[in-house]
Amino acid sequence: MAIVQTLPVPLEPARETATAPQTPAMGSVSSLISGRPCPGGPAPQRHHGVPGPTFFRQQDGLLRGGYEAQEPLCPAVPPRKTVPGNSFTYVNEDFRTESPPSPSSDVEDPREHQAHNAHLRGPPPKLIPVSGKLEKNMEKILIRPTAFKPVLPKPRGAPSLPGFLGPRAAGLSGSQGSLTQLFGGPASSSSSSSSSSAADKPLALSGWASGCPSGTLSDSGRNSLSSLPTYSTGGAEPTANSPGGHLPSHGPGRGPLPGPARGVPTGPSHSDSGRSSSSKSTGSLGARVAGGLLGSGARASPGSSSGGDRSPPPPPPPPPSDEALLHCVLEGKLRDREAELQQLRDSVDESEAAVCQAFGARQRRWPGEREDCASHAQQATQRVQRAQQLLQLQVFQLQQEKRQLQDDFAQLLQEREQLERRCATFEREQQELGPRLEETKWEVCQKSGEISLLKQQLKESQAELVQKGSELVALRVALREARAALRVSEGHARGLQEAARARELELEACSQELQRYRQEAEQLREKARHLDAEAAGLREPPVPPATTDPFLLAESDEAKVQRAAAGTGGSLRAQVERLRQELQREQRRGDEQRNSFEGERLAWQAEKEQVIRYQKQLQHNYVQMYRRNRQLEQELQQLSLELEARELADLGLSEPAPCICLEEITATEI
């Protein structure tokens, strides 16, 4: 068995992780409930601490649920052991069940607290998220968390025991129907722990008288009993091995209780999580008085060692009277309350352990959750700020657009007023111009007749102008052709003059050559005569010089003459042949030049004729283009006149008024 360690619960979640608290002092609920000894021996002495603040709300109301079987009004109460009223409570290992982990605890919490909570064989029972009273269904082991409500002290007084227990007894009888239904009948498999134990326990009035001789309770005891919540159980497992009103103890190795199939609940169910803390706030005096009240039936037990030195039980009482019957009924109720409180204590122990574990897990999770909440809040604040800035920007833009639209609307209104004024002005002008328009129409009709006459004259003048223009163009073309022919003839004349000058130059050159040839021929004739004279002189025997060539001296005279004549005649013939060749060469060169001159003249003549033909064709094309342009202009003018006449007809004029250029009209002689 282990001591339940309760933690103070602050109103605001702490940022630090939950640390292991010291061993707290238990309230007066533990002192009013007779404790059960440990399986191995008596409970060791433990020091008491200052009672912690009560954070859990006291469960108010009457006991719900009833006994299914009746029992005798004054059952025999066997001797039972009494435990001194201590301010601590043991965790009930007998009713520890293998329940799933609490929804508010993490998955790894049982592993983290395995060493710290080694006395528990399984995870704590579930917490119901909705607080409330105990329900009849004991099959599900669930604990409902409740709000914290401290115990309010009642005014001091000394009420009698019937007056102290009267309201609750009346509530029980009112909810159950009758005392016979509460205590009568045999116990069934699903009856409560008090009804099952009451069938085997005799009632000792002497124990009641010795336990509470004055019939009064102290303030702390009364407050403790009055602050106890109503509790309804579906029954506990009856056993013949457990003496008194104690619940069966299975021990650490026997496992959980049997299931609902045997009519026994699996453990305490639907108890408030703050009952143990609220019961710890009562004083020690109430604990001693309640211990005397609840321990009266156990003084007769020979094995009782926790009650201390007390007086022996008195002799059996006489036959029960009304008062004795009332005392019996009240003691039976008190025994039932003791059984209920015992089961409530077990439930509160397990609930407190589960609440401690859940609170420790939640307290460890709180800093992270607070950081997450702070980060989420910061992100939400940033998003809200951004959204607010965006909304402000949109509002500013919409305001600007609204102002701009208002300005545009005002401007449009002004423009509308101006247009309305202009429309009114136009209407007035139209009314004023109506008669003037009629006069203008008559004037236009008169002018249209004059214009038609002027138009006819203009057409005639334009036809004459076109004819004169065509004649002028023809004359210009003829002039151009004449000028071109003149230029051609002048060019031809210049070419002929140049050719003549070239011929003259060639003739001069030829005459100069001929003169030179003649001079050379004269010179050759003179040389020939001179040579003839020399030859005649040579025919005479020459006088030998004083010094002659010995070879010539040996030669005869005839040989000398023949040799001299042969040398002179050979040189002349060579010169004549050379002159003949030069003359033939000059003749051939002159013929070639004459042929080239003739070819060039023919090519120039052909090119001149081709240029003349191209110029004539170009002039003819120019004349045709000019005539075509004039024709197109006339057609365009005719179409424009027809269009103007159609427009005037559409306007409603009697006679169309052709549009005539004023310059042409003024330039035309009427």
UniProtKB/Swiss-Prot annotation:
Region (Disordered): 1-52, 92-131, 150-323
Subcellular location, record wording: Cytoplasm; Cytoplasm, Cytoskeleton, Microtubule organizing center, Centrosome
Biased composition annotated in UniProt, kind: Low complexity: 187-199, 242-251, 260-310
A Pfam family recorded for this sequence: Fez1
Disulfide bridges in this chain: none
Keyword Cell division: yes
Keywords linked to the UniProt accession: Cell cycle, Cell division, Coiled coil, Cytoplasm, Cytoskeleton, Microtubule, Mitosis, Phosphoprotein, Wnt signaling pathway
Region (Required for centrosomal localization): 1-333
Any one cellular-component term (Gene Ontology): vesicle
Nuclear export signal, short sequence motif: residues: 632-641
Region (Sufficient for interaction with CTNNB1): 448-670
Polar residues bias (residue ranges): 213-233
UniProt record, GO biological process: fibroblast proliferation; kidney development; microtubule severing; mitotic cytokinesis; negative regulation of canonical Wnt signaling pathway; negative regulation of fibroblast proliferation; negative regulation of protein localization to nucleus; negative regulation of Wnt signaling pathway
Complex and partners: Interacts with CTNNB1. Interacts with KATNB1. Also interacts with gamma-tubulin and KIF23.
Protein's job: Negative regulator of katanin-mediated microtubule severing and release from the centrosome. Required for central spindle formation and the completion of cytokinesis. May negatively regulate axonal outgrowth by preventing the formation of microtubule bundles that are necessary for transport within the elongating axon. Negative regulator of the Wnt signaling pathway. Represses beta-catenin-mediated transcriptional activation by promoting the nuclear exclusion of beta-catenin.
Name this polypeptide is given: Leucine zipper putative tumor suppressor 2
Species whose genome carries this gene: Rattus norvegicus (Rat)
